[in-house]
């Protein structure tokens, strides 16, 4: 026997522990809890290495699942030379494509169409630092507390918005910088309409800015397009549509946007 295989030699001679299978099963059951704990607690270099390892494992698993699913889907049967014999009824559908393949391709096509439909005019925008976005407000008798922030960019707040009590309001959205309407341009009709804003869908800078309703360049907003008289295929009037802000509202003093059609 080769060197350094004394463990295997001992197992062959004396066998394993009586509770080996039970311990092995319990260890495998604990593995998921250990991975979850490591994912939450590991920091720094070890955390990065762990995340990298888990990512590669998930990619390999997805590839394995995909190949397994593709192996299940059968394509059309290879046509034989026509020898003049009539096929029985139960063999007539062999020449048709498999339904699973057709469904898969149709789903992919719909995803591509959806991506094209919502292609935005500004795919990339310049990042904004927190120092530029927030201004520190000093509070307290000696002006020593600095836990309040004031947003220096234009924002949108809903109709039923009420400020929190002053002592508890951490982030201030000034009334002078609040916007309710936007100059929306329809790219196909080539018209610009002053439409009310319904909400902020996504701010590319940060999810927190989306929640606060900050209006910066590249932000996706929802506007009320009922004035344009757009109608769906079913005959219903379109109420809200998305538009992307194309200017810097804090510099121009207004919101200019392009409708996503």
Curated annotation (Swiss-Prot):
Motif range (Nuclear localization signal 1): 15-22
Region (Disordered): 1-34, 61-85
Matches recorded under InterPro entries: NSA2_fam (IPR039411), Ribosomal_Se8/biogenesis_NSA2 (IPR022309)
Listed GO biological process terms: maturation of 5.8S rRNA from tricistronic rRNA transcript (SSU-rRNA, 5.8S rRNA, LSU-rRNA); maturation of LSU-rRNA from tricistronic rRNA transcript (SSU-rRNA, 5.8S rRNA, LSU-rRNA)
Record keywords, A-Z: Nucleus, Ribonucleoprotein, Ribosome biogenesis, rRNA processing
Quaternary structure (record): Component of the pre-66S ribosomal particle. Interacts with NOP7 and RRP1. Interacts with RSA4 (via WD repeats).
Descriptive protein name: Ribosome biogenesis protein NSA2
Organism for this UniProt entry: Debaryomyces hansenii (strain ATCC 36239 / CBS 767 / BCRC 21394 / JCM 1990 / NBRC 0083 / IGC 2968) (Yeast)
């Amino acid at each position: 026997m080769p060197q350094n295989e004394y463990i295997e030699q001992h197992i062959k001679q004396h066998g394993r522990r009586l509770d080996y299978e039970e311990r092995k099963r319990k260890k495998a059951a604990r593995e998921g809890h250990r991975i979850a704990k490591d994912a939450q607690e590991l920091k720094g270099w070890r955390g990065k290495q762990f995340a990298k390892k888990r990512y590669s494992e998930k990619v390999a698993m997805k590839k394995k699942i995909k190949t397994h699913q593709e192996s299940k889907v059968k394509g059309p049967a290879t046509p034989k030379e026509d020898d003049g014999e009539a096929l029985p009824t139960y063999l007539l559908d062999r020449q048709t494509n498999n339904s699973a393949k057709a469904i898969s391709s149709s789903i992919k096509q719909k995803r591509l169409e959806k991506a094209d439909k919502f292609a935005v005019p500004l795919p990339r925008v310049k990042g904004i630092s927190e120092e530029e976005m927030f201004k520190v407000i000093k509070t307290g008798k000696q002006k020593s507390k600095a836990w309040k922030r004031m947003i220096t960019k234009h924002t949108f707040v809903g109709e039923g918005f009420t400020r929190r009590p002053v002592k508890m309001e951490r982030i201030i959205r000034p009334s002078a910088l609040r916007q309710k309407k936007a100059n929306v341009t329809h790219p196909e009709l080539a018209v610009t309409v002053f439409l009310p804003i319904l909400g902020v869908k996504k701010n590319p800078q940060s999810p927190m800015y989306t929640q606060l309703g900050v209006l910066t360049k590249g932000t996706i907003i929802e506007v009320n397009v009922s004035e344009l008289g757009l109608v769906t295929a079913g005959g219903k009037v379109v109420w809200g549509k998305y538009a992307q802000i194309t200017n810097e509202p804090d510099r121009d003093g207004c919101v200019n946007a392009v409708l996503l059609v």
